[in-house]
Amino acid sequence: MSNPHSQNLENLKNSEPTKSEPTQLNPIQSEPTKSLRIAIFTDVFLGIPGGIPSSIRAQKASLEALGHQVTIFCPGTPKDYMNPLTKFGANQDPSIIIVPTAKFLVNGAPFSKWTKYVTRFIEQKYPNLAETFDLFHIHYEATTSMAGLLLAKKYNIKIVQTMHGREDMAIAINVPHPFKTLAATGINLIHHATLKPITKKSPKPGHQNPEIKKSPDPDYQNAEIKNSLQPSHQNPALKNLAPTIARRQMWQMMVRQANLADQVITPSAHFAKKLQLFGVTRPISVISNGISDQEIANFTPRIRTYQDHEPLHILWFSRLSKEKRILPFLESLRIAQELEPNFRFIFTIIGDGNQMSKVRKFCRKHFDEASIKVLGTIPHQEILQKYTKDQHLSIINSYQFDTQGLTILEAAACNLPVIYADPDMSEIVPNHGGLCAKSPAPRAMAELLLKIYHQPELIQKLSQNLAASEKTYLQSHQIEKLLKLYRQLS
């Protein structure tokens, strides 16, 4: 039986990249209908690097370019958004509304106050919500997002809910035992109590909601996802996805949030399947988060080449956190050098996080200074333009956490091959432009690195595949699908 983690390298060598038509930026033609007034609710601080804030910023820009009105409700302070690293100043954009924000930080980022304070603030600022907005688009599951649900139900406004991430894994990875069980149970209880007034009005599992008949056509409905699943109580995969109380509690929270929406969006089919497996009954559409067209508007990526036994240039641009598994990848580099003393690399790290000190300590202990470049936080707009130039590979090392991995799409836009540990990410990598390790173990990634090191022609082949891929991951393509959903709900 073939290993689902592995990529057949012989097939890769013999394959021809799929050709695609040249992609124009902003190919959308405005529809001859009225512009929409969209309110986005998110608990994610938009000034930090990362897939969710990047996708929200790109979504806002694309919708506004088409003449739609977008208002974002999010946590933060004017001081936070004036940080030059963010280049996303709320003080300069009146359509970014900062909700009441707690004085403490959560994972280094601002977090909104209790939901009741957020709803009160919004109702005072917009006393006629139903006349101000056509629909709400919610991008998370915490206090501001719950405020969006409560207000939408109160004012009879349609809801689109994007489910971005595996909150069960975030708790499982980052919170130590036994506190993870307490934390997850507490979060789920608060979520349930806050939404209890509207939860009883939402459709129960198996209930035929008439809205489903009005939902997007089969191209966006992904009927094959529904048909491929057994009823949740019969499916043994549930035990694998939620083997602990903590993870089950977080799945309950995610499912509750999704089932209160009129339409659910996920960035990948594999995540959509998992949500339905756990009981999401609302229509789900798979729409990529997308990357901003402007990020690559003045950028001409080249085909990567790698010469025999030169240093392998590897780029990391993501959080330095446990769920992203930066330390296991550093261990892979150490093992690769141990297995092949002639293996040389230059590993560039862009990003920050709670594992920065451990990263620096590991690098000082095991690698020479020339092999590691720790750059910290770089303005997101500069990463693709300046820092991918001399790279051979991009790495995304998370496992069962990322639902899409925007890093993959950004690397693809640069024709930069991707190596990864999670076979679910194969769905995201365009046109066989990357390689997956045989397992998430550090040694498996080390073996993949050495395979590339000894077969340098793979870099050019992977890069050519990416160059020939259709650029459907651009926001200008994804926004067409999103607008179709909006139109059918509004």
Give residue ranges: language-model regions.
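Carbohydrate-associated surface elements
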Residues: 270, 290
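Nucleotide-activated donor-binding/catalytic signature segment of Leloir-type glycosyltransferases, i.e.
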Residues: 360-378, 390
